[in-house]
Amino acid sequence: MSMYTHQSNNELIPLKTVSTLNDLIKTIRIIFNQKEINVNEIHKILNDFQCDFTEWQKYIYFNKTHYTRNLIDEGNGRYNLFLLCWSEDQGTRIHDHSGAHCFVKLIKGCIKETIFEWPKYFTVEKSNYSINQIDLPLTVKSVSEMRPGDVTYMHDKIGIHRLHNPSTTETAITLHLYFPPYTNSMIFEESTSRMKKMDVTFHSKFGKQIPQ
């Protein structure tokens, strides 16, 4: 359960309990109606938020061959709120976030996050990809494990990362908030640092599976 106040145009929104998924969606929409977005405020709301697990059920789709991305709210083009559903031992490729701010909250299971330094040929400030990519392995910056309720924040200025469900017996579910939303990202080979573009697609939208 989360309690929040938010100042909008010098008017204080009354204290409200955020204890349902619908409350969370409304709260996030209020925040994104403002000109300036406070990432610390978003982190606190997501960190404090808990709801009944049954509220996630319509967005949960598992696939034995790959994790699934399931859209909950597209925020009028300003953000994407979605669930990732991970079967046993599934993970992402190492990837960037196309300049977006990315929050991840673990709903169920365990997720291992490995953050890597940017390849030597890449300059984040200039978004400069070198044509001559040197085949050097990526450098690990940090490794951590998320437990239910944990919230992490990621941005390209921090590095690139990989998420993985390390369990061979349990599934995992994560809630993601990305802003601004994006339709593709760069994926990287760990052993060579080489990269290529990957489209970002959804397995389901608003609880309905998309025909593949």
From Swiss-Prot:
Cofactor(s) named in the record: Fe cation
Entry's Gene Ontology molecular function annotations: cysteine dioxygenase activity; ferrous iron binding
GO biological process: L-cysteine catabolic process; taurine biosynthetic process
Gene3D superfamilies listed in its UniProt record: Jelly Rolls
Keywords attached to this entry: Dioxygenase, Iron, Metal-binding, Oxidoreductase, Thioether bond
Pfam families named among the record's database cross-references: CDO_I
Ligand binding (Fe cation): 95, 97, 161
Record EC number: 1.13.11.20
3'-(S-cysteinyl)-tyrosine (Cys-Tyr) cross-link, chain position(s): 102-178
Family: Belongs to the cysteine dioxygenase family.
The name this protein goes by in its record: Cysteine dioxygenase
Taxonomic source organism: Schistosoma japonicum (Blood fluke)
